[in-house]
Structures are given as structure tokens and as C-alpha cells.
Regions:
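Outer-membrane beta-barrel porins/channels
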Residues: 3-190
Length: 190
């Protein structure tokens, strides 16, 4: 018969995403990157509700609507400003944790059975700010990416002891099914 049952609850931190980076210097290249991303795109596509078109990158839209890039040909773009100094700031935060509820049993000192239910959770935020200036003008590009999620997975294990000196075991862990919610934002101030 059943000799004992054990129940366990645990919390484990799987990842920590906290870090901050600041880089300063000349020629950061925000507007040049906007031009490169926009080359090949005619101005008419940026004039009428470009946010509704998933084929148009948000850097192109922000550069155009922030008056940082100008068309020079039908589908070629150049910088409308000449920034010389820049500061890039990146801030990341968040964690991935796992909550586990487990059960184990000893049956007749011959069968050992274990079951586990794992619930991983995650939260991650990345904020980026790129500021560029010259003596007269300045621009700041800000972006934010935020993801949260929760998932589920299971484990099962079995050990058979046919004699005192021999144990045969097997275990199986399911893949984790996870649901994520992602939010992004971007804006430019000139």
C-alpha cells in the first residue's frame, strides 16, 4: 500500500533582466538610420495614415513626422539636420519566475511516483532613449517594449525498485505552453 505522500510548493527565480547602459559620443547616427530604413519608400506612403500599414517601419514614420528626414528623389531620403553629439540610454528590467506544485508518493517501498505542475511567469521592459544635438537643434527618440506572460508545464516521474540494489526510473517533462502580451511604443521629440 501507500507508505507516504509528500506535497511541495516552490518559487524559483529563473532570470533577472535588470541592467542600465548609457553611451555618449559623436555621430550616433539616429537620423542616418531613419534615412536608410526609409530609402526605397515613396513619400506618399508616409503622408496618409502610415501607422495603419504594417509594411512601413516606425523609424521611417517618426523621422518623417518629426521633420528629421526629407525626400530628395522619388524614394530616396536625406537628413534634415546635422546632429554632432548623442546620448544613448538603455534600461531593462524584469524577471522570469517559476511556481511549482509537486506531489510524490512511496507505494510499498517498490514504486515511487512524482507529479509536478509548473507555472512560469515573466515580465520584461526595455526602454531606449537616443538624444542627438547640434548647436541649434535637438531630437530625442524614445521607444518602449513591455512583455508579460504566464505559462504551464508538467512533469511526471516513476521509479521502480524490483530489489534493494536496483532502481529503474523514467521521467517526462512537457513543453511549456506560454501566453505573452506585448506592448510597444515609440515617439520622437524635436
Amino acid at each position: 500500500g501507500m507508505i507516504y505522500n509528500n506535497f511541495m510548493f516552490s518559487i524559483q527565480r529563473l532570470a533577472n533582466f535588470n541592467r542600465d547602459v548609457v553611451v555618449e559620443g559623436a555621430g550616433m547616427g539616429m537620423v542616418e538610420t531613419m534615412c536608410e530604413k526609409t530609402n526605397g519608400l515613396a513619400e506618399k506612403y508616409l503622408q496618409d495614415k502610415p501607422w495603419d500599414d504594417v509594411e512601413i517601419g516606425w523609424l521611417s514614420i517618426l523621422g518623417y513626422e518629426g521633420y528629421l528626414i526629407n525626400p530628395i528623389a522619388q524614394d530616396q531620403w536625406q537628413s534634415a539636420v546635422n546632429f554632432t553629439e548623442g546620448t544613448l540610454s538603455i534600461s531593462e528590467s524584469g524577471t522570469t519566475d517559476q511556481y511549482t506544485l509537486s506531489w510524490a508518493s512511496n507505494i510499498s517501498n517498490q514504486w515511487y511516483v512524482g507529479l509536478g505542475l509548473n507555472i512560469p511567469t515573466m515580465s520584461y521592459t526595455k526602454r531606449v532613449s537616443l538624444q542627438e544635438t547640434d548647436r541649434i537643434n535637438s531630437a530625442e527618440l524614445k521607444s518602449m517594449y513591455h512583455a508579460t506572460g504566464v505559462g504551464v508545464s508538467g512533469t511526471i516521474g516513476l521509479i521502480y525498485r524490483p530489489m534493494q540494489a536496483l532502481r529503474i526510473g523514467a521521467s517526462f517533462q512537457t513543453p511549456t505552453a506560454m501566453s505573452l502580451t506585448v506592448q510597444t511604443e515609440g515617439d520622437v521629440h524635436t
